[in-house]
Structures are given as C-alpha cells and as structure tokens.
C-alpha cells in the first residue's frame, strides 16, 4: 500500500488550502468563470513547480 511521506502530506495540505482560498476569493470578488479557471490553473501550476523544484524557486516566482 502506498503511503505519503510527511513532507508530501504537507505539500498536499498546502495545495488544498491554497485552492480553497482561491475559491473563496473568486466567490467574494464575484469573478467570472474564466478568471476563476485562470486562478485555479495558476494554483495547480504553482503547486507542481513547488513540488518538483522545491520551495525557493516557487517563492522566487511569486
């Protein structure tokens, strides 16, 4: 059975929190669906960049 390492679990939790935050910002700001999808895709891309290359590069891209 595959088990997540502690660091991977933290990355997934951070991604989930980021995704939920972006959802709330989109709802509160009454963004259009296309804008929301853009934010969602940016969150997914940012997550994979951070997961692949590590935190420093991810923070530099911000």
UniProtKB/Swiss-Prot annotation:
It is found in: Membrane. One of its GO terms (cellular component) is membrane. The chain crosses the membrane at residues 9-29, 42-62. It comes from the Eukaryota. Keywords: Membrane, Transmembrane, Transmembrane helix. It is a multi-pass membrane protein. This is Uncharacterized protein YFR010W-A. It comes from Saccharomyces cerevisiae (strain ATCC 204508 / S288c).
């Amino acid at each position: 059975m595959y088990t997540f390492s502690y660091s991977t679990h933290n990355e997934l939790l951070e991604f989930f929190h980021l995704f939920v935050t972006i959802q709330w910002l989109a709802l509160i700001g009454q963004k259009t669906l296309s804008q929301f999808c853009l934010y969602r895709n940016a969150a997914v891309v940012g997550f994979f960049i951070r997961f692949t290359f590590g935190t420093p590069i991810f923070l530099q891209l911000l």
